[in-house]
Curated annotation (Swiss-Prot):
It comes from the Bacteria. Residues 139-143 are annotated as: Flexible linker. The RuvA-RuvB-RuvC complex processes Holliday junction (HJ) DNA during genetic recombination and DNA repair, while the RuvA-RuvB complex plays an important role in the rescue of blocked DNA replication forks via replication fork reversal (RFR). RuvA specifically binds to HJ cruciform DNA, conferring on it an open structure. The RuvB hexamer acts as an ATP-dependent pump, pulling dsDNA into and through the RuvAB complex. HJ branch migration allows RuvC to scan DNA until it finds its consensus sequence, where it cleaves and resolves the cruciform DNA. Residues 144-193 are annotated as: Domain III. Has three domains with a flexible linker between the domains II and III and assumes an 'L' shape. Domain III is highly mobile and contacts RuvB. The lineage of its organism: Bacteria, Pseudomonadati, Pseudomonadota, Betaproteobacteria, Burkholderiales. It comes from Burkholderia thailandensis (strain ATCC 700388 / DSM 13276 / CCUG 48851 / CIP 106301 / E264). This is Holliday junction branch migration complex subunit RuvA. GO terms for molecular function: ATP binding; four-way junction DNA binding; four-way junction helicase activity. It holds the Pfam family RuvA_N. CDD domains: UBA_RuvA_C (cd14332). Residues 65-139 are annotated as: Domain II.
Length: 193
């Protein structure tokens, strides 16, 4: 298996790039999150890769971070999700945004990704629950309401609020807020609504 590729970036045609490694050019498909952070053509590039071997082709997918690659691998384990759809998910949202959507069970966020319908989004949420964990790093940079969003959500649901109301209230809770403080802030937001 090819786990990493380092060389000179020769071409950039989204979502495919061409990387020269000692005279051999490798075509690598990358998510748009990786594509936008690539160096200019002619410069050195290092990518973590995932090789997919099919009956008719050997396809190489590249990622700048270990979190992107491990998320790609988790997506491939889901029934009905192939490499193209997994790449589309990572192109349409960051790993942190996907992790947040799974934590909050936000199917609407996933359906904004081209090619993901309601049923597929629900299947992704169901099968990814509890799998996007510590190896994906913190949700920093995402619009994450809180590190304890799931606990806060469950508390609000137990208090009788609808999921829609609870999710709207949680979005106002800053990252790093504890559960009890997050519940207080959410209840304050709900009382103003």
């Amino acid at each position: 298996m090819i786990g990493r590729i380092a060389g000179t970036l020769l071409e950039k045609n989204p979502p495919r790039i061409l990387v020269d490694c000692n005279g051999v050019g490798y075509e690598v498909d990358v998510p748009m999150s990786t594509f936008y952070n690539l160096p200019h053509t002619g410069e050195k590039v290092v990518l973590l890769t995932q090789l997919i071997v099919r009956e008719d082709a050997h396809l190489l997918y590249g990622f700048l971070t270990p979190q992107e690659r491990s998320t790609f691998r988790e997506l491939l384990k889901i029934t009905g999700v192939g490499a193209r759809m997994a790449l589309a998910v990572l192109s349409g949202m960051s790993v942190a945004e996907l992790s947040q959507a799974v934590t909050l069970q936000d199917a609407a966020r996933l359906t904004r990704v081209p090619g993901i319908g309601k049923k597929t989004a629900e299947r992704l949420l169901l099968e990814l629950k509890g799998k996007l964990g510590a190896d994906l790093g913190p949700l920093a940079g995402a619009a994450s309401p809180s590190d304890h969003a799931a606990d806060i959500l469950n508390a609000l649901l137990a208090l009788g609020y609808s999921e829609k109301e609870a999710l709207a209230a949680i979005k106002n809770v800053p990252a790093g807020t504890g559960v009890s403080e997050g519940i207080k802030l959410s209840l304050k937001a709900l009382s103003k609504a």
